[in-house]
């Protein structure tokens, strides 16, 4: 009997609950006003007590959620999508939708969210009533009920079908994108107004300094206007959105609060990602692309702080504040002491946590997009160094913030291979860009790890070029070169104070170690315990046994530019040998024995590389100094001997005869073709040798006849020409000098005669004659027969011949003479014009010829002709005979020289 009564009462309670909490009509829900929890009717409390008594809590809650689900699916979903009946959702696209249509869609979206929020608030209020009367004392989490309600709403409204999900995401994307654009324009509008006010204040001042500042602000204003234009993607103006910025932001924040309550913000993460990342990319590309002279990273972060993060705070932190968001940091640092609600504190903490996560993601995106933009232009930044220094410093900050090392190395190596490391680039240009790369990488990554990887293909490529060492050594000795300045500024004290006379070559075990100027090893033991730098460039120390490396004795390892250049060949031996060879060439061409520059260069190199490696070079300089002194001594001695012997004929034998005495073991091998000197020169050489043997007994001289310089003054007719030539060229032209007082230009010599007199081959004589032929000193009268080219006498003969011809043609009519003269003049003008055009055409091709000879060292005539025809067919249309004539002119201009059958750059 009792059991039946209990069942009956429980049924009555259930029916009462169903009647009270059944889903009302749409109007009743929308007009619902939430009551305070303290004003709950006593009858309702008693009803819920019976629910608890009969343990119907779970049953009631499940029933209510099921009722909500049915309502959402059958009624609310239809009501929501009715707002978009006039919108073609299937073709909805933010990029093609007009501003008016977009504004209508956003208005309808706001109305639909208001509807959902009112319905949600109604059910939330009832769930709160259930929680207060049924579950509060059981430590039941009210947030669990809200989360379940939110999930039901999302599932049954937006995610009923895949198509509805797509439509809703599109609408949500368009809503947030349009608001962001509007918010950005509002920001620039406000900023423009601030700049305008500052400009008005500046106009009141007549100070020149203020005028300069005003000009800078005007430039900044123009720049901001350009930035603002980049965001006006859609057909809308500032007035198209809510005119009053404050009202607009308040409306947006109110809608965002509702979206937060409905949990739509959380599910919109992908939409935020698309919008914000897209805007970050567009902003960086618009402002920074191709501009390297300014630093942009700081201004980009400030823009993100004032625009991106503030807009994001309006969305994510709208539920944590009731005031207008001017600075999101104020919300983060604000502690609502008056708020004792633990749930609100928890919600605020969660919102701040989500916001900070987003902030970090966006900051990472800024660094990533900026670094990607700069890495894609890194080669151009290197080419424009040091003008690109601000951009390189920005990239250095990105390098410290995010992992871009691998991307940067891969991209730069690829670009270097495509744009720099190819046969068309001059070696000097490659070295210049290599040096700029060293400086740029030193700014980005001071540890040097990136440069080590990026520089490897450059070093390998340069090591394969024959003129690399010569180009580098030239940069060491040219005062205008950056490397020379670095060499001058080198401080030997930075080497760590080794005892081996600052020698940078240390012996450790069986290997040679090259110590850079940045290393500071107080002893060889310090080196044993050194370990490589970390990615941030910091150094560490380790202990082995009882020995400990002292971190205080270590400095940050850093290779200078010279170290990188030397490491192309993994040592300095090749460089020193090449320098010795180049020094030999320069010293052998010295006439006045002015060695100050060479002595300075050697001293600088000794400081950098040590004394021992430059010992031979010092001996070479010493030979020059000793030769100058010995020449003076021998001349004075010879003059005294002649005066004592009353021999006036030999008094001036050695007056213009200078000899350079070389220590054969210390100079590079000096090879050349020996020949027979004229007797007058041999006589001077014998006199000099005897005096030398007398002074330097028991030493003897071994003459290098092919070396040296001869100053010649050639008098041909009434013209005197001066030349500085090699001994063999001087000897060759002296053979044309008459012995019996006759005119030199009447003397004809055959190739065979010249070969016998010089005691060299005919081919070599032919080769040496080219110089005098190109300078028009001699001419070939017949096959392998030559004579002095006296132009005055030839012109005189031609004039005499012309007079004789004119006398013979006096019987011809004047009209015919005039016609013939006109024809001849026209033909000469045509030939002259054609020759000039051909000359100009060949001069254009000259740079290509010089470039090919620099890269390939030596090339025969046929190879040069084929390469020009293949690669410059539009510019080069000459025959091989015309090319040969032009190359002869370049030889005459001493730009190139002919060695055998090959042309090469004249050294």
From Swiss-Prot:
Pathway noted in the entry: Protein modification; protein ubiquitination
Disulphide bond pairs: none
Acidic residues composition bias: residue spans: 214-226, 804-830
One Gene Ontology CC term in the entry: cytosol
Pfam families (alphabetical): ANAPC2 (PF08672), Cullin (PF00888)
One Gene Ontology biological process: cell division
UniProt keyword annotations, A-Z: Cell cycle, Cell division, Mitosis, Nucleus, Ubl conjugation pathway
UniProt-annotated stretches for the region Disordered: 203-228, 790-838
Name used for this protein in its record: Anaphase-promoting complex subunit 2
Organism field: Dictyostelium discoideum
Gene: anapc2
